[in-house]
Amino acid sequence: MKRLFTGSLLCLAFAAGSVNAAIEPTEKDAIAMAERGAAFMKAHGKEEMMKKITAKDPDFVQGSLYVDMRDIKTGIVLAHPINPSIVGKDLTDVPDANGKKYRREIIELAQKQGKGWVDYQYKNPTSGKIEPKTTYILRVKDVVLEAGIYKK
């Protein structure tokens, strides 16, 4: 009986950890999602990837973690699952809540290194509040895929 009880507690603890992980994605999750997007794009093309993002495909949108896409030369947003009103716009010089032009930093990092992390403040779609965010960026040909997580 003691083993059954202990086993049940372990299962509950594991399940609770899994639920928590799903609610709060990690840097590893962001990297994996961006890389999954890059692999899909290489296999199916940019247009198909844009359709997946726009359709909020569960491979590329999971709660507050999602992939968006921007043109590496112009900075124009090509696809965004949470805020489609910014698609087609160049927001490169629009700062975050603290005045940081993080989108310019994203483009420069993508052009120079091809991948990396950028920190800034952004509205969390889950909480509705401006929160610290870090985004993994990955260059794929002429676009930048971005997948970010909110810091706690």
Where are these regions (language model features)?
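N-terminal membrane-sensor/transducer module of prokaryotic signaling receptors
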Residues: 2-152
